[in-house]
Every structure is written in C-alpha cells, then in structure tokens.
Amino acid sequence: MDKYLIKMPTKTNLNGDQKPAALKGTPKTIDKQKEKNTPTEKQKQEDDYVEKENTPKLRNAQIAKPASKRKNQDTPTEVKDIKNEEDGENPPKRRSARLTRSTRSMAEEGTPSPEKEKPEKLPFIKYKGAIKYYTENHEIAASADDVIQWIDKQTTLDVVPMAFDMEWPFSFQTGPGKSSVIQVCVDERCCYVYQLSKLKKLPAALVALLNHPKVRLHGVNIKADFRKLQRDFPEVSADPLIEKCVDLGVWCNEICETGGRWSLERLANFIAKKAMDKSKKVRMSKWHVIPLDENQLMYAAIDVYIGQVIYRDLEQREKVKLQNEANFKEQNGDAAFKAVKALGETFLDKITQVTI
C-alpha cells in the first residue's frame, strides 16, 4: 500500500489585536474551539482538504466504481495494481477448481476430463425398432422362452450381451414402490417390455433367461437393480446375476481411462454421441398402472436400446485397444509400454511415434 505524507495543521497563537468571541463550555472544550476558530487554522484546514483531494490515491478512487457496485470491494490502490497487472505480459491466473483423484492427471496435462466436459448439442435418440410389450404371466413366460431359443441359436457366439433395466413408481411420501417393469434388449431391432404389476411371482422362463449361461447382462448401476428385484421377488437370487453382469460406467472407465460415476444419459453423450430425452414427467410416472402409454413404452425401450449400442461400441474399443497394446509391446518392448502407459496413454488410437 502506498503511503502519502499529509501536512498536519500547526498550532498558532492568536494575534494580540484580535479579540476572540466569547465561548461557552468547560475550559478544556473552550481551548479546542479557540484553536479551530483562528483564521490561520481555518486557512490551513482548507489547504489540507484541497491537498488531500488532489492525491493520486483519491483520484483513482473517484475514477473507480463505488464500493457498493463493486463485486469485490478493493481499495483504490488495489484497483490500480490490478489494472497494471492486466496490462502487463502475464495476466492474472484464475484459481483452479478443486481436483479429484480421477481428474487430476488430465487437469495437470491441460486436457479436460471427457466426463466433465460441457455436453454439446447432440441429436436425440430415435428408436425405430419393435417394442414387444406384455403384462400377463403366460405372455411374459412365452416371450422369455422365445428369447432363450434365439440365444441358443447363436452358435458362433460364446457370449450374448443383453441390456437390462427396471422401472418402478416413486413417491416422496412413501418412497420407491415395487418393481413394476423389466425391459431387455438382445438385438437393437427389438426391445422387450415386461410389466410385472399383475404378477405375484416371476415366471420361471424369465428367471431362466436372466440366469442363462451365455447371457451377459449389462446396464448402469445394474447391481442395485438386481438387489431390488430380489427384495421384491425373492425367487430371484441377486448374487449370481451380479457376478456375471457388466456395469457400463465401470467398463467405460477401464477402457477409456476416464473416472467418476456415469449415468446412462452421460454415457450416451460420450460414447454414442446421442442425447436422451429424460423427461421427469415420464421418469416419475405411474409405472405400475396398466397399460403403459406410448411415451412410457418408448422411454423404457430407449433405455435398453442405447445400452446395447453403448456395449457394442465399448466392446469394439476394447478390441482396438488390446490390439494396439500388443503391437506396441512387440515393436518397443514392455519397458517402453509401461512408461507410455504411465503417461496416461489409452492406446485407443494407434501410436506411430514414441518420444519419452
């Protein structure tokens, strides 16, 4: 802070020819009034006032915005220092946001974390496939049996991915209701929606479909869905399903070297470059009421359809990554591979040149 020397008034004696006016008060206050009322003292006070008004400090304060209108009430000198700093070669640095363990490495390299990027305007998902909707026990059993037969015919595949999701009503007064809808997708051209409202017990064929040895169930936060399904329908055992399922968010972090928890909507943005219409009106609707309307059916179908699309994309990325890693090790050795891997290389793209 700059310091300014301000000339203080000096005490002078009254001229003998002048007669001061009669003053009232105690002797102490009268002496003070005498000092203030002298002509010399008044003139010096005026000079001091003018001198103070002309100081650079107050001139800058007059130019700056009033304190009440400034977001940060800086002193005039600080305002001047900030202006000089902005005019210099090095502009003031903004305080960095708090870094989490998952985003620290990317932030240090100056690369934004993909899952933290502001979503761009993406086209909405348009599902044009079939939606097979069933509400009766025997209909659900027959449909599940048809899916099992289709899976058994896929003799060239050791694993058949099947997108899985659930819906249930929710009330702020009573909390989540009983599991009301199960939707699955094994082929992007057809989604199955099973409404469970009339069922006291799940059909054996549906339970067999979920536990099929070739089926790989996948979804987002899918383990919590299985636990809820077991609570609502005890004939379902959650542990075997959890052991063989794939959480798409966790898998994405492993393949793409990202971090944090994912929602299905954000995964669709990041992987499929599509936007999802997550209408609260539909999401919080009465899923237990039969029949479901067109908006509910489309909402349920899109959830598993885009899940299947994301799985296929991640599966392809994993193949490319493993192939690139194998080629790099063969050409450069394990030591170079570990060094490049430590630098954050994902190997999702082919590396043609290495500089360490």
UniProtKB/Swiss-Prot annotation:
Residues annotated to bind Mg(2+) 2: 165
Compartments reported by the entry: Nucleus
EC identifiers of the protein: 3.1.11.-
Keyword vocabulary terms for this entry: Exonuclease, Hydrolase, Magnesium, Metal-binding, Nuclease, Nucleus, Phosphoprotein
Database matches in CDD domains: WRN_exo (cd06141)
BP-aspect Gene Ontology terms: negative regulation of mitotic recombination; nucleobase-containing compound metabolic process
Modified sites of kind Phosphoserine: 105, 113
SMART domains linked to this entry: 35EXOc (SM00474)
MF annotations from Gene Ontology: 3'-5' exonuclease activity; metal ion binding; nucleic acid binding
Range of residues in the leader sequence: none
EC top class, as a word: hydrolase
Renumbered residue ranges of the record's region Disordered: 1-120
Biased composition annotated in UniProt, kind: Basic and acidic residues: 29-56, 71-85
GO cellular component, one term: nucleus
InterPro entries for the chain: 3'-5'_exonuclease_dom, 3-5_Exonuclease_domain, RNaseH-like_sf, RNaseH_sf
Protein role: Has exonuclease activity on both single-stranded and duplex templates bearing overhangs, but not blunt ended duplex DNA, and cleaves in a 3'-5' direction. Essential for the formation of DNA replication focal centers. Has an important role in maintaining genome stability.
Protein name per Swiss-Prot or TrEMBL: 3'-5' exonuclease
Originating species: Drosophila willistoni
